[in-house]
């Protein structure tokens, strides 16, 4: 579906949030989102939650004056929820957000400025995950900005911190479980999107994820796989994902649904 471009004083942004049992974190995330200084269409996709978080979100957003759409995706897996949410987007830009992440009030405004300044050749504006504390915050910023400068054709952030020109995102196929049903889907998606243009990072474009993540070994790649990714030239990235990494993830059972198990969360 081709996006309906909305310019001027009207809404240019859609925010897609996949949700599965996020009662402990979603309220704070929504509070940060409705504090944005830029107008947006909020799309919340319930992926089979059983903890009441979506009903609570309806109550929390009842008096919010912006446009909010609640969708239901019964197929288990964040990738399906994201696919459903992206299909409902008809604005110029799309922000993918996580239900456990804080977004500063200027988040969408910063992304808008980056897209408008860079022009149509830039298809993604990526935030970095800022860590708490002055030293850790500066280190996380410098790390991501340097990596993005050295390897501009690769992904250097979380899917919770990615924003896109909707036309490029949808033309690339968006999140697609038939192409990539595994973890690390944000990297695979960026591989496809960046075939259509460039990405931009900036020191003032950031967000902060929750500290609930502890042992993430079952939902991420190994150090060796990460090194291979960074050392693989752009012309061979297709083979890296679909011939190398997919086979390894499949053998380890690292499909997208492992994110629902929450064995990696702090309890």
Model regions: which residues?
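Short, acidic, metal-binding catalytic loop of nucleotide-sugar glycosyltransferases
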Residues: 31-40
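A conserved acidic beta->alpha catalytic loop
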Residues: 46-55, 101
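Glycine-rich, basic loop-to-helix element that forms the pyrophosphate-binding segment
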Residues: 73-89
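Short aromatic/hydrophobic "clamp" motif used to bind/position activated sugar donors
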Residues: 94
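Conserved donor NDP-sugar-binding/catalytic core segment of glycosyltransferases
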Residues: 106-136
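A recurrent flexible, glycine/aromatic-enriched loop bordering the glycosyltransferase active site
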Residues: 129-133, 146-163
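Acidic donor-binding loop at a coil-to-helix junction in glycosyltransferase catalytic cores
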Residues: 180-188
């Amino acid at each position: 579906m081709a996006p309906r471009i909305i310019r001027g004083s009207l809404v240019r942004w859609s925010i897609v949030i996949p949700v599965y049992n996020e009662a402990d974190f979603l309220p704070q995330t929504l509070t940060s989102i409705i504090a944005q200084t830029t107008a947006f269409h909020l799309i919340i996709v319930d992926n089979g939650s059983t903890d009441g978080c979506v009903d609570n979100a309806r109550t929390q957003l009842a008096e919010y004056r912006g446009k909010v759409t609640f969708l239901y995706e019964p197929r288990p897996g964040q990738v399906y929820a994201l696919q459903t949410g992206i299909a409902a987007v008809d604005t110029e830009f799309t922000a993918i957000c996580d239900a456990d992440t804080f977004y500063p009030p200027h988040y969408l405004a910063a992304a808008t400025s980056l897209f408008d300044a860079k022009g149509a050749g830039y298809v993604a504006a990526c935030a970095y995950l800022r860590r708490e504390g002055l030293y850790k915050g500066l280190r996380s910023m410098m790390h991501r900005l340097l990596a993005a400068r050295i390897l501009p054709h690769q992904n250097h952030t979380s899917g919770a911190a990615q924003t896109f020109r909707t036309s490029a995102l949808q033309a690339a196929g968006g999140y697609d479980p038939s192409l990539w049903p595994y973890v690390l889907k944000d990297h695979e998606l960026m591989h496809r999107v960046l075939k259509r243009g460039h990405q931009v990072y900036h020191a003032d474009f950031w967000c902060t994820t929750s500290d609930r993540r502890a042992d993430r070994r079952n939902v991420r790649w190994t150090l060796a796989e990460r090194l291979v990714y960074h050392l693989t030239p752009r012309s061979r990235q297709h083979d890296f994902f679909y011939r190398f990494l997919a086979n390894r993830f499949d053998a380890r059972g690292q499909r997208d649904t492992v994110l629902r198990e929450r064995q990696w969360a702090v309890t």
